[in-house]
């Protein structure tokens, strides 16, 4: 064994207490963590997220059948589709409770970037269980 001490810059992993991961959708989306959903255009990434949002907003189940519990709030921020003609109809078609799904209106408040204070403010006020940024490249 190598003898060493923790310094101000480094922490030894032996000094870290392991913690359990809490899952929103096991084993795909961990609660409180950043998860990237990647795929080619047309693979169904947005459709899958819409279905998960719908289930989460109504307290349904994950795509693999795990119950989600009580209805939760979600922020779905999308730059590629129209809110009224595409996003809301898709949410309704998936059975979402749109009273639990919100977005920052970029037409009213201007464009967003990932480091925008308005995202943090929206999260503090709305307290979502899930925040979806679709696609992330549009907000870099």
Q: Where is each model-derived feature located?
A:
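Conserved inter-motif catalytic segment of the P-loop NTP-binding fold
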Residues: 3, 10, 19-20, 24-26, ...
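Alpha-helical interaction segments
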Residues: 13-15
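Walker A (P-loop) ATP-phosphate-binding motif of ABC ATPase nucleotide-binding domains
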Residues: 34
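Residues at the beta-strand->loop junction immediately N-terminal to the Walker
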Residues: 38
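Hydrophobic positions on the alpha1 helix immediately C-terminal to the Walker A/P-loop
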Residues: 48, 52
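Gly/Ala-rich phosphate-binding loop of Rossmann-like dinucleotide-binding domains
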Residues: 57
């Amino acid at each position: 064994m190598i003898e060493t001490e923790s310094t101000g810059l480094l922490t030894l992993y032996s000094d870290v207490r392991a913690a359990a991961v809490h899952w929103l959708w096991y084993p795909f989306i961990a609660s409180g963590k950043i998860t990237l959903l990647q795929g080619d255009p047309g693979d169904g990434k947005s459709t899958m997220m819409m279905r998960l949002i719908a289930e989460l907003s109504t307290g349904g189940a994950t795509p693999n059948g795990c119950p989600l519990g009580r209805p939760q709030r979600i922020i779905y921020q999308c730059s590629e589709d129209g809110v009224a003609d595409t996003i809301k109809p898709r949410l309704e078609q998936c059975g979402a409770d749109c009273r639990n799904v919100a977005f920052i209106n970029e037409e009213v408040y201007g464009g967003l970037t990932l480091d925008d204070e308005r995202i943090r403010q929206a999260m503090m006020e709305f307290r979502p269980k899930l925040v979806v940024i679709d696609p992330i490249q549009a907000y870099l």
